[in-house]
Amino acid sequence: MSIHIQQVNKHFGNFVAVDSVNLEIKTGELTALLGPSGSGKTTLLRIIAGLEQADSGIVKFNGEDITTQHVSERGVGFVFQHYALFKHMTVFENVAYGLTVRPRKTRPSKAEIAEKVHSLLKLVQLDWTADRYPSQLSGGQRQRIALARALAVEPKVLLLDEPFGALDAKVRAELRRWLRRLHDEINVTTVFVTHDQEEALEVADKIVVMNKGRIEQQGTPEEVYDTPSNPFVYEFLGNVNLFHARVKHGHSTIGNIHIPSPEHAGGEEQQGLAYVRPHEIEVLTQPTENAIKVNLDLVTIVGPVARLEVLTEIDEQLIHVELSKVQFKQLGISKGDNAWIQPRYSKVFLGEGI
């Protein structure tokens, strides 16, 4: 089931929640709506579901205009952040609920419902919980049951609103990998909302970055992370260092160092901001012509990763550097020592006020 959104707008009073959004989601695609709070991602998801009506614009499923269609007629499955399981029902009864409340003409037999429920419980690897109640399950298990319940009605589209937001970090990481494998198996067009950059990068086929009701960029995780279209996307997708830069003849100059900048090949010098991610900086223990002298101010070891905070000698600008713990140990430096840093890559955005 493909989804096509054309010039969709939604206001709540004077607040612009969704602003002229155009988006196409292919059949079987797993798409992440990623953005900070208030960016419009959940409102857009609810418009797709039919839980909110757009002020203007068109929503199509497989080319059919369903903009004014009631949520019950759209064939969507919805999973919320807080499970929404019925506490007084067993797991089996929760998963079966959407089938048992169908009109008699379209309702499967009890045997067919039982077969479907047990099949779904096996799919989410919880077939042994059929007779238990939600209170007897962990948060991660409850969310998987909520997903099984959404799948029971064989939705054309699966919509997930921050499905792992209420879970601890380890369970979230496990469920992300599980959701990716599950999607590859069932191949239902899926849209999920998240503010977690790592979650979107790990799980999605396509990421749609939203801010202030608009789409800032959309593309594969690799495209969005490696080639951000603007400063907002660059800063939102992970830590970044900012340097004032001068750009001319395909090179950017940061202080006393020069970095290739082939996207800016013009002959006239321009000012801009150079964005450099912490892992794109090399640390040296000896001075070199094309490096910045720094002092090591803080070292934080997080498992296999070493995170450094260094201060530049000239203006004491704080710079974040990330490398493996093994690489850091090999450098043989510690807090208070001098070192030299060399950005391997930078992305320069030109213009005043950037």
From Swiss-Prot:
Database matches in NCBIfam families: 3a0106s01
Chain sites annotated for binding ATP: 35-42
Protein name as annotated: Sulfate/thiosulfate import ATP-binding protein CysA 2
Primary role: Part of the ABC transporter complex CysAWTP involved in sulfate/thiosulfate import. Responsible for energy coupling to the transport system.
Domain of life per record: Bacteria
One GO BP annotation of this record: sulfate transmembrane transport
Family membership: Belongs to the ABC transporter superfamily. Sulfate/tungstate importer (TC 3.A.1.6) family.
Localization per Swiss-Prot or TrEMBL: Cell inner membrane
